[in-house]
Amino acid sequence: MMDFVLLEKALLGLFIATIVAITISKLRGKKLKLPPGPIPVPVFGNWLQVGDDLNQRNLVDYAKKFGDLFMLRMGQRNLVVVSSPELAKDVLHTQGVEFGSRTRNVVFDIFTGKGQDMVFTVYSEHWRKMRRIMTVPFFTNKVVQQYRFGWEDEAARVVEDVKANPEAATNGIVLRNRLQLLMYNNMYRIMFDRRFESVDDPLFLKLKALNGERSRLAQSFEYHFGDFIPILRPFLRGYLKLCQEIKDKRLKLFKDYFVDERKKLESIKSVDNNSLKCAIDHIIEAQQKGEINEDNVLYIVENINVAAIETTLWSIEWGIAELVNNPEIQKKLRHELDTVLGAGVQICEPDVQKLPYLQAVIKETLRYRMAIPLLVPHMNLHDAKLAGYDIPAESKILVNAWWLANNPAHWNKPDEFRPERFLEEESKVEANGNDFKYIPFGVGRRSCPGIILALPILGIVIGRLVQNFELLPPPGQSKIDTAEKGGQFSLQILKHSTIVCKPRSL
């Protein structure tokens, strides 16, 4: 009975909203020059035409029809899509302040405390403060040099564990499971000076389960209808309640098992002022100085759990998959490692710069299988102009970075996984965004600061695996499945494949 009453009220509200929208559109005096796009209908906009799955490939189809700048009206939200290097430069660099905010939806409002974090907050003094507080303990070359030995140790442990598993060399294993532990340990060493001993560690299992559920809920397209059309939001109550429960459990776990434990440790020992601090020590100091509050501390931990751990893991998994499916490239990379470093000499962080083909493999992985293909969405707080068009305030701006890096107008045979391109015709193109046709980490004020950690970690992990194993598809298969799984703005491998890891005699 209650559901029927709710439905009746929603339909009545929807009818009234339709009439109001039509009336307002006719009475509105200001005529805007909006970017081209499909003709919207009242209330629903283009939502019923284009559907929920606005992945990078679907958006390319619309760009081919409407141009490199087009607009979709998704219910009550404006979605502006940028599909050329020139327009990307305008949004991310030239007008970086105007388009430097973040848009959030009803689910991300829950998971970020309405922007109390760094990644999803609007461009403001709060963002500048959070970025500054996070940079020193996480995103500097000093951090890389301090923790690269830990990354090398974690990679060595992966090699040992895989070699100790007889199944790995015969039928194969889901290597991703062990690499997930590696990435958690890499970042938890930096954050808390902590690591998990095994994939069966109860705390690790609880942590990754909660993080996984958070990602599933946030990346899903299931809740679009209630986000696009607020009058339908009552139908999301169950979904949003689950999001709130997961958010509360995660923040409590971060606080009880990691942040508070670190505070206790610091309170019972005499800390040498010259001793090395982990990242959370710096963050807690900022809280003690009154620069941020306890919630901000926990949302910083939440950002690292998602933005640093998950995205790098996706890229490692994609890189390995492409090496398995391209054995000649794998062989060529192994030859470089053996020749430059010497047979049996394990790659370390400083060695990555001596290995141009390894760097090319990493760049090509980030181009061909971009983990965040539409970047993290941008937003303009106020009315803005772009390419002569009016962009209404609070529009969601998507830069199709995947298409910039896979457009045949700018790349030679982009549908081929070919690292050699970065040693030949694209030798001057770097992952830091020096060329706007290749911006896997974004560019400008809201670019991903994690690039300074991701590139060396990718080099160490992929390098060690190729040095120590011949990576093969399972028996009876010539290739592993690389079907894609998209999300709100993520690109993951759909199936975590079984990979045969045949040890090399070094």
UniProtKB/Swiss-Prot annotation:
GO terms for molecular function: heme binding; iron ion binding; trans-cinnamate 4-monooxygenase activity. InterPro entries: Cyt_P450, Cyt_P450_CS, Cyt_P450_E_grp-I, Cyt_P450_sf. Its EC number is 1.14.14.91. It comes from the Eukaryota. The keyword Transcription regulation does not apply. Heme binds at residue 448. Pathway: Phenylpropanoid metabolism; trans-4-coumarate biosynthesis; trans-4-coumarate from trans-cinnamate: step 1/1. It catalyses: (E)-cinnamate + reduced [NADPH--hemoprotein reductase] + O2 = (E)-4-coumarate + oxidized [NADPH--hemoprotein reductase] + H2O + H(+). Its cofactor is heme. It is found in: Membrane. (E)-cinnamate binds at residues 214-219, 307. GO terms for biological process: lignin metabolic process. It is a single-pass membrane protein. The keyword Heme applies. Keywords: Heme, Iron, Membrane, Metal-binding, Monooxygenase, Oxidoreductase, Transmembrane, Transmembrane helix. Signal peptide: none annotated. One of its GO terms (cellular component) is membrane. The chain crosses the membrane at residues 3-23. Belongs to the cytochrome P450 family. Catalyzes the first oxidative step of the phenylpropanoid pathway in higher plants by transforming trans-cinnamate into p-coumarate. The compounds formed by this pathway are essential components for lignification, pollination, and defense against ultraviolet light, predators and pathogens. This is Trans-cinnamate 4-monooxygenase. It comes from Petroselinum crispum (Parsley).
